[in-house]
Amino acid sequence: MSFLDLAKRRYATKNYDPTKKISVEQIEELKQILTLSPSSINSQPWKFTFVTDPETKSKLAAQSYMNENSINKVNLLVVFHVMEDIEHFEKRNLSILPEAWVSGFYEPLVKANGRANVKAWMQSQVYLSLGYFLSACAHMGLDATPMEGINLKMYKEILSQDGYAPLFAVTVGYADADDWAHPGNLPKSRFALDDVIASI
């Protein structure tokens, strides 16, 4: 299947089949894929928590508003975090990069614009990994739903990943055959190519 065909097939699943579970091998493959995610200057300011423990997953589901039902039906929830401490990020992540990348890009174009800009830039890197992850899921024949509608404060408390703040989560599983959001039932709604693509 071509990547274009995968893109046409992929959608934010709303109703999962609770009888179909992701295998341990698939979960391990997804872990490896996420470690290979791209980021600006290879900064990697992230952590990914793979939640398969039913009790923990249930606690997180209760803090996920309209996404609670989806989380309870799948056996994998992945939480994407960003590093909180800028100084720790610079010491741990940037110190191992080529000096030219740091002095030629990070310091004059990111850090020079203030701490809020650094924080926003770090979060942007985590979102890059999300697109990569969703594409990988589609390639593996898995259905996934990215979710920003979660209680970030409670997610942080439940997961206890010191030094990292949760940004969003993704359910991964298999869609129910009758999922109302499936493109076969609800055609994809996207702007026309000419509205979003410029060719110069």
Set out the residue ranges of the language-model regions.
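Small-aliphatic-rich amphipathic alpha-helix that forms the alpha element of a beta-alpha
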Residues: 34-36, 78, 100-101, 106-158, ...
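Short secondary-structure junction motifs
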Residues: 43-46, 142, 167
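N-terminal targeting/leader regions
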Residues: 1-20, 26, 33
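C-terminal helix-cap and adjacent tail motif
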Residues: 5-7, 11-15, 167-200
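A glycine-rich helix N-cap at a beta->alpha junction
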Residues: 68-71, 77-80, 161-181
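Glycine/small-residue-rich phosphate/adenosyl-binding loop
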Residues: 49-124
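Short beta->alpha linker loops
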Residues: 22, 55, 150-151
